[in-house]
Design a protein with these regions (language model features):
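Catalytic alpha/large subunits of respiratory electron-transfer oxidoreductases
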Residues: 25-26, 31-32, 36-37, 41-43, ...
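Generic anion/oxyanion-binding catalytic loop in active/binding sites
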Residues: 18, 61, 163
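Intrinsic disorder at enzyme termini
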Residues: 6-7, 136
Length: 351
């Protein structure tokens, strides 16, 4: 008699369809509910839960729907048994085959700490690195899954346009053509993409200034005062959100523009902080007081008595939506004046 054989019915669970990013192997699930707690408490969406009791219990999504958030990729890292894995990365490489490089995310203004795993010359995946000062242990789905876009439509060699068509060229030939064009040009303009490295941007800056040109660094037409860097850099840090009792959002939608920052604001809100919004009211993952949509609201706030608020740690976050308006410079100046009036309120220009 074989006493070691398990003769009871074995537990089997159907896999879930959580969308194109997260692959599921639910027979591995041990019902630890880490994924449920993350989506509910950190991401702020109630789309996962546990049904049944005992051996019939299983983790599932609400009505079998896919996850609708900018952060659910983090449940891949949280799952202790491999029931939730990255669908784009699955079965493409082994961890010991990868070269691991620490880097900084450039998909939003938060600057999350990440690890880039490469195999040969190909980027295979991005993983979060713990950094309490910025992203804690989370990254957005845009950051986590943008790597596959780095493989396609890449320029592998320089090209020269002749008779309206591009033809491949060598680097010496391309640089020679560029030198001739620059020497014979009366005006020179240079454009730098969002994903260009700092070294390349600095080299272009030296080139333009060497030709007597004017350098202007501005993101998406933001009305930033070039002569007063302190006006837009701000005095607050990301960590200060954890201690803030009042948070003001001006022209910002952090849930879309910086999901990890939004999760940090939600954590402060859950602790008891109040959140105010100036601008279009957006769908956030926490309750917020909509103060108004017009920029003149900031001026009205300056006229109020702030003695009760001055003793509380507060933060003003100015988003890109406010800075790209025609009156973006005035909004930034008004926000800075409000920050100074609410001393010791801190000022954080974001996104």
């Amino acid at each position: 008699v074989d006493f070691s054989r398990f003769r009871e019915p074995k537990r089997a669970v159907d896999d879930l369809d959580l969308g194109p990013l997260v692959e599921t192997h639910m027979t591995r699930c041990i019902s630890c509910t880490r994924c449920v707690r993350f989506t509910t408490e950190v991401a702020g969406i109630a789309q996962m839960g546990q049904t049944g009791r005992g051996e019939d219990s299983e983790i599932t999504s609400y009505l079998g729907e896919t996850l609708d958030s900018n952060l659910p990729g983090n449940i891949i890292d949280l799952c202790p048994v491999g029931a939730l894995v990255s669908k784009p990365y699955a079965f493409t490489a082994r961890p010991w085959e990868l070269t691991k490089t620490e880097s900084v995310d450039v998909m939003d203004a938060l600057g999350s700490s990440i690890r880039v795993d490469t195999k040969g010359r190909e980027v295979m995946r991005f993983l979060p690195l713990n950094h309490d000062g910025t992203n804690e242990e989370w990254i957005s789905d845009k950051t986590r899954f943008v790597w596959d876009g780095l493989r396609r439509q890449r320029l592998d060699k320089p090209y020269i346009r002749e008779n309206g068509k591009l033809r491949p060229a060598t680097w010496p030939e391309a640089l020679g053509k560029a030198t001739e064009a620059i020497k014979g040009a009366s005006t020179l303009a240079g454009l730098v993409g969002d994903l260009a490295p700092v070294e390349a941007a600095y080299a272009l800056k030296d080139l333009v200034e060497g030709q007597g040109g004017i350098v202007e660094c501005r993101t998406d037409g933001a009305k930033l005062p070039a002569g007063n860097r302190a006006a837009y850099v701000g005095t607050a840090t990301i960590e200060d959100i954890d201690d803030a009792e009042a948070i003001m959002l001006i022209g910002s939608n952090p849930r879309v523009e910086a999901p990890v920052l939004n999760a940090r604001i939600r954590k402060a809100w859950a602790r008891g902080a109040s959140v105010g919004v100036i601008g279009e009211m957006v769908d956030l993952t926490y309750e917020a007081n909509h103060i108004g949509t017009d920029a003149t609201v900031i001026g009205d706030l300056l006229k109020r008595d702030h003695s009760a608020v001055q003793e509380k740690p507060s933060i003003i976050i100015v988003g890109q939506g406010a800075l790209t308006r025609g009156d973006g410079a005035a909004i930034l100046a008004a926000a800075q004046a409000l920050a100074e009036d609410l001393d010791p309120v801190e000022f954080l220009e974001d996104l």
